[in-house]
Design a protein with these regions (language model features):
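Short beta-strand element of the conserved SAM-dependent methyltransferase core
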Residues: 106, 204-208, 251
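N-terminal Rossmann-like NAD(P) cofactor-binding subdomain of oxidoreductases
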Residues: 2-145, 149
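Short helix-capping/linker segments at secondary-structure and domain boundaries
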Residues: 140-142, 280-283
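Metallocofactor- and cofactor-centric catalytic cores in central/energy metabolism, strongly enriched
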Residues: 8-9, 13-16, 21, 36-42, ...
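Solvent-exposed, flexible loop/coil residues
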Residues: 109-111, 264-267, 271-273
Length: 283
């Protein structure tokens, strides 16, 4: 079986964690791990594992247009938009792990985009909440408001995450609206500096005129089982509670400890989702 030739651009926390995960998959082959600084930790780790590296950023792909079949963009929301035009001209599929809104929103347990050339993985909070919000939206009447609050350990947030917080909020809100058809929503991201570091946790508040509770609960638990197939440390920590027509629930995501420690579930959830999309495309 021919291996899937993969490129990764962006060698920070997300890109490096993704690299380690992909190296464990026999059917994937990382042809290039590309950043801007040869002395970065991510590039150093990639070199130690025998992966070809470059510090030329997008220029590497311009000069080597056939170097991969699919590229994961782990840079930042602004650069990802610029990169997308280049990859489109080269016929390279893009899985965008930045909140750029440059491609079609993708949540692997909700929609399949096998024929799309550019898929946007939204955000960690989006991947944590949207599968459940989508399920809930099918079992309530007149859903009017959604609020999603995520907290992640400050130590798990790299430079790109900090630069992209406004993009994070806007992109997650837009994706929630797309998947639930609720216009009024609010997204909050808290970077928690506590020591010891906190796990990623996402709390959802859903307001509707009424909820069809039994089918809703069945739908939620079935969706969690589905999510755990590709996000093994995803768990419901506060089951749904309804008070005054507002449903509240919380999930927690631990990491696998591939690059950063287990508290960095925000890396795991978006990277595992990106890998799941790739498997569905080429499976």
């Amino acid at each position: 079986m021919e291996k899937i030739k993969i490129g990764i651009i962006g060698t920070g926390n997300i890109g490096t964690d993704l690299l380690i995960k992909i190296l464990k998959i026999p059917s994937f082959e990382v042809n290039i791990f590309c950043g801007r600084r040869l002395e970065s930790k991510g590039i150093g780790l990639a070199k130690s594992k025998g992966v070809q590296v470059s510090d030329r950023g997008i220029e590497h792909f311009i000069n080597n247009p056939k170097c991969c079949k699919i590229v994961y963009d782990c840079t930042n929301a602004i650069d990802a938009i610029k990169h997308a035009k280049i990859f489109k001209d080269q016929g390279i599929k893009v899985i965008d792990l930045t909140p750029s809104k440059g491609g079609s929103f993708c949540v692997p347990s909700v929609n399949e985009l096998k024929n799309e050339m550019n898929m946007n993985m939204i955000t960690c909070g989006g991947q944590a909440s949207i599968p459940l919000l989508y399920s809930i939206s099918k079992h309530c009447n007149q859903l009017t408001y959604i609020e999603v609050v995520s907290q992640i350990a400050s130590d798990s947030a790299g430079m790109a995450t900090r630069l992209n917080i406004d993009n994070y909020i806007e992109t997650t809100e837009n994706a929630i609206t797309q998947f639930t058809e609720v216009e009024k929503c609010k997204v909050i991201l808290n970077l928690n500096p506590a020591i010891p570091q906190v796990d990623m946790q996402t709390t959802m508040f859903i307001k509707a005129n009424s909820f069809d509770f039994e089918p809703l609960m069945g739908s939620i638990y079935n969706k969690i089982i589905e999510l755990k197939k590709y996000i093994p440390h995803y768990e419901l920590v506060m089951p749904p509670v309804i008070n005054n027509n507002v449903l509240v629930m919380s999930v927690r995501v631990k990491g696998s400890g591939d690059y950063l420690p287990e508290y960095a579930g925000n890396l795991d959830i978006i990277n595992c989702a990106a890998i799941e999309v790739t498997k569905k495309i080429y499976g």
